[in-house]
Regions:
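A short, aliphatic-rich alpha-helical micro-motif
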Residues: 48, 126-127
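Conserved catalytic-core segment of NTP-binding enzymes
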Residues: 84, 96-98, 105, 114-125, ...
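Primarily NTPase-proximal linker/entry elements flanking Walker-type ATP/GTP-binding cores
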Residues: 2-62, 66-83, 87-90, 101-102, ...
Length: 176
């Protein structure tokens, strides 16, 4: 929020003025401040022999599909985790093709689902995978019908973790 940004600016500015630092030292000071004060999420927290199902949800255009592909790549290429992709984003032009391209590159199976029953079947199909990543269509929190559709879709399995993806420039009042 803006108050956090103000605190960072005050702290780093005061430190730089008191120490008469150069711009490079100021950058390092900012990096040190952020490192000490930011909480870094450890990701999806995938544990051995425990399956994880994660759905990325959020408004249109925030990068859910790209984020999903990056998570999949990191899990598969760096950690050797067995994974599968599911897309329920059949609304955006080329969304399915984009995810199919990622699945081809990573050698991952992919299913395209149009409703809750198909999602349930796809999750069952991938039951041996350690990680199942679900891409969803962009939804506005102000559109009750869209929110209800998303809720019904993800209700097929109580183990689906919902991860909200929003733009870094989203205003605090819009995120509520």
């Amino acid at each position: 929020s803006e108050s956090i940004i103000d605190d960072v600016i005050r702290s780093v500015t005061a430190d730089c003025l008191l120490a008469n630092r150069s711009s490079e030292e100021a950058r390092r000071g900012l990096a040190d401040y952020l490192e000490k004060n930011l909480i870094i999420n450890e990701g999806l927290g995938i544990k051995a022999r425990r399956r994880k199902i994660a759905a990325l949800i959020g408004p249109t255009g925030v990068g859910k599909t790209t984020t999903l592909a990056k998570i999949a790549a990191q899990c598969v290429l760096e950690k050797g985790i067995s994974a599968a992709l599911i897309t329920a984003d059949t609304y955006r032009i080329s969304a399915v093709e984009q995810l199919k391209t990622y699945s081809d590159i990573l050698g991952l199976p992919i299913e395209i689902v149009y409703n809750a029953k198909e999602l349930k079947d796809a999750i069952q199909k991938f039951r041996t995978k350690q990680l199942i990543l679900i891409d969803t269509a962009g939804r506005s929190q102000y559109n009750r019908r869209q929110m209800q559709e998303l809720k019904e879709l993800l209700a097929v399995n109580p183990n689906i973790e919902k991860h909200l993806v929003i733009s870094a420039t989203t205003k605090e009042q819009d995120a509520k």
